[in-house]
Amino acid sequence: MYEEMDSLIEKASILIEALPYIQKLYGKTVVIKYGGNAMINEKLKNWVMEDITLLKYIGVNPIVVHGGGPDINSVLKKLNVESQFVNGLRVTDMQTMEVAQMVLVGKTNKELVSMLNQKGGKAIGICGIDGNLIQARKHYEYVNGEKIDLGYVGEVVSINAKVLEMLAKDEYIPVVAPIGVGEDGTSYNINADTVAAEIAKAIKAEKLMFMTDVEGLKYDKNSKKIISAISADEVLKMIEEGKIDGGMIPKVLGCIDALKHGVNRTHILDGRIPHCILLEIFTDKGIGTMIHL
């Protein structure tokens, strides 16, 4: 009996620990970039959907921006189309664009919306074409000074924040696929990390969170010690020193850009940890790395 009571008291203590964080975030917006292994592993996916649904029920407004690289790769492989990347960006010809739009908007997005709704959330799936949410233009990449045409790869020109504000007002959880639209109606495939940061900036989110497949940032890649908090200047120095590279660069640069445009806190989370969102937001220790100005 005493063991059972101790267990109940421990659960109550955890809830009380979360109280000040709940009070601080009540009515605020949190943008979550959902990607990595947490999108592939069904258990992790289930936990993430539970976290997001709980956020909504306690008065936080979550906005989910998702990738879909593995799903796109799978379909392209079946079509015998080889994937090519330049500086981490997918080269997107017409056929690849059609596949990306079909997969991101028609498959990945709807699966996430369905899961959230099954958990009791009130989710709605949208992409940048809907309501001109993500207005975009063609993006060129530069390699050793050479201008590279990536096809239908876009960059964000502006975000129509009113669309997201309207959905939040009606208690919806927006789930955003990173497809943007140009002035002439052309669809563009856009890096989901960039889209998440731009949305966070446009709506002045309280938090921007990137789910990744790493524990967090480290001063030494071989070290087990994770940096719990780091300034934007230190992050830029680590990029110069080669301590941050690859797919982590657009994430941390997105964090810094968001911070400079009114977002209060940005986080790099290990999406492989069960309930990583709740652990970061509602516990004293948190997990992953917080980036601040």
Swiss-Prot record:
Site (described: Transition state stabilizer): 33, 251
Enzyme class: transferase
Reactions catalysed: N-acetyl-L-glutamate + ATP = N-acetyl-L-glutamyl 5-phosphate + ADP
InterPro entries attached to this UniProt entry: AceGlu_kinase-like_sf, AcgluKinase_fam, ArgB, Asp/Glu/Uridylate_kinase, Glu/AcGlu_kinase, NAGK-C
Keywords carried by this UniProt record: Amino-acid biosynthesis, Arginine biosynthesis, ATP-binding, Cytoplasm, Kinase, Nucleotide-binding, Transferase
Subcellular compartments: Cytoplasm
Cellular component terms (Gene Ontology): cytoplasm
GO biological process assignments: arginine biosynthetic process via ornithine; L-arginine biosynthetic process
Chief subcellular location: cytoplasm
GO MF terms held by the record: acetylglutamate kinase activity; ATP binding
Transmembrane annotation, as ranges: none
Residues given in the record as substrate binding sites: 68-69, 90, 189
Enzyme Commission no: 2.7.2.8
Family under the similarity heading: Belongs to the acetylglutamate kinase family. ArgB subfamily.
NCBIfam families, alphabetized: argB
Name under which the protein is recorded: Acetylglutamate kinase
